[in-house]
UniProtKB/Swiss-Prot annotation:
Per-repeat ranges for WD: 8-47, 50-91, 144-183, 186-225, 283-324
Subcellular location: Cytoplasm
Species for this entry: Xenopus laevis
Disulfide-bonded cysteines: none
Descriptive protein name: Eukaryotic translation initiation factor 3 subunit I
Keywords: Cytoplasm, Initiation factor, Protein biosynthesis, Repeat, WD repeat
Amino acid sequence: MRPILLQGHERSITQIKYNRDGDLLFTVAKDPVVNVWYSVNGERLGTYNGHTGAVWCVDVDWETRHVLSGSADNSCRLWDCETGKQLALLQTNSAVRTCGFDFGGNIIMFSTDKQMGYQCFVSFIDLRDPSQIEDNEPYMKIPCSESKITSAVWGPLGENIIAGHENGELNHYSAKSGEIVNSIKEHSKQINDIQTSRDMTMFVTASKDCTSKLFDSTSLEHQKTFRTERPVNSAAVSPIYDHVVLGGGQEAMDVTTTSTRIGKFEARFFHVAFEEEFGRVKGHFGPINSLAFHPDGKSYSSGGEDGYVRIHYFDPQYFDFEFES
């Protein structure tokens, strides 16, 4: 499995995201650039320039018309996907940690960090109402006083968002009323990443407590647990098989103080039903920060602390593989 190496960032990767068709791959890092690549051959299509700080999150809508990015320069920006033109600039009081389009691409949500005396907020803006963008006035802002949000995605049908917190909590926030509909605490440490399955019925979390867990999207019921020996930074669900891929590794500041075994940085494949690991892919120099499966399930990509993004196309053996418990 020879990976395609994408080198378009000077700093460590923070998030990577495929569009719905899977022909484009969006990458952001701790530098101010948002990159977009052709996933088939790794050719860089272009960049979205405008941010002045590290970019923490990126999302693309269902029709690949708009791109959304959130940055440590205290702004969330909306871009025209095709031309790279900035369509909207939403100023915030603190860094934007997560962002996302809803199912129809009309409503965006983004969450801000708890820093510099400001509280963590989740904001919802309806793009069909120009006044909300011009006045920088979201139709709803939900304060999170307890623990800040570290990862968030839209739930099924755009009715609510699933948010993971610094203390390991998972919450369902209603996109209409802003109330917490459901709450669960299955992780003991920070939730680094949440990704839904292709049909949005399940989602997988990645946590600093060295586990990744599978949950039901509507009830938040805990289904499966995948255990590792090191913090998990990202996890993704295969769209065609009962597989999840986990990526992680020690934080950069802890690397010199731990044994080399804990500092390993492979992508690890687990079977969903049996919770068993069945494969590993080496490659990155340093921890893996973000993972994404291609929507057709025939390849996956990983972004690392080394600033590289690797696109891996699976070998034929992967598709013939039968898991025996």
